[in-house]
UniProtKB/Swiss-Prot annotation:
Ca(2+) 2 binds at E98, T100, D105. Residues 45-80, 81-115 form the EF-hand domain. The keyword Protein biosynthesis does not apply. Pfam families: AIF-1. Transmembrane segments: none annotated. GO terms for biological process: actin crosslink formation; actin filament bundle assembly; actin filament polymerization; cellular response to oxidative stress; cellular response to type II interferon; inflammatory response; microglial cell activation; negative regulation of smooth muscle cell chemotaxis. GO terms for cellular component: actin filament; cytoplasm; cytosol; glial cell projection; lamellipodium; nucleus; perinuclear region of cytoplasm; phagocytic cup. The modification N-acetylserine is found at S2. It comes from the Eukaryota. This is Allograft inflammatory factor 1. Residues 128-147 are annotated as: Disordered. The lineage of its organism: Eukaryota, Metazoa, Chordata, Craniata, Vertebrata. It is a peripheral membrane protein. Keywords: Acetylation, Actin-binding, Calcium, Cell membrane, Cell projection, Cytoplasm, Cytoskeleton, Membrane, Metal-binding, Phosphoprotein, Repeat.
Amino acid sequence: MSQSRDLQGGKAFGLLKAQQEERLEGINKQFLDDPKYSNDEDLPSKLEAFKVKYMEFDLNGNGDIDIMSLKRMLEKLGVPKTHLELKRLIREVSSGSEETFSYSDFLRMMLGKRSAILRMILMYEEKNKEHKRPTGPPAKKAISELP
């Protein structure tokens, strides 16, 4: 990101996200061409969904998700973790750094055998979005129905 303190955000943020999306599309293409993942059914739509989720939490557009982004993601999902648990999770996922993980690491985890944790997180988030609150006044309850 640029060194200047331009706090505007609209157009610059849009350009940053467009560049980030192009970069992630290139990585998706590498995974589509990789014979290791050729047996994975519906791979293009999975990669697209993973790209959207990754972009949602990589707000600064630097290509890596750090501890604070992961913490925000898990808190948003209602599964807060301690700092040590977050470090351990990132260490399991990342191929190099202990403080961040890249989109490639994220895809390897999602498409590999260790994807159960993150798949569960993403599935939980989707279920949370589908649940709509009832509209209108609440139903009347009798005293016998109260706990």
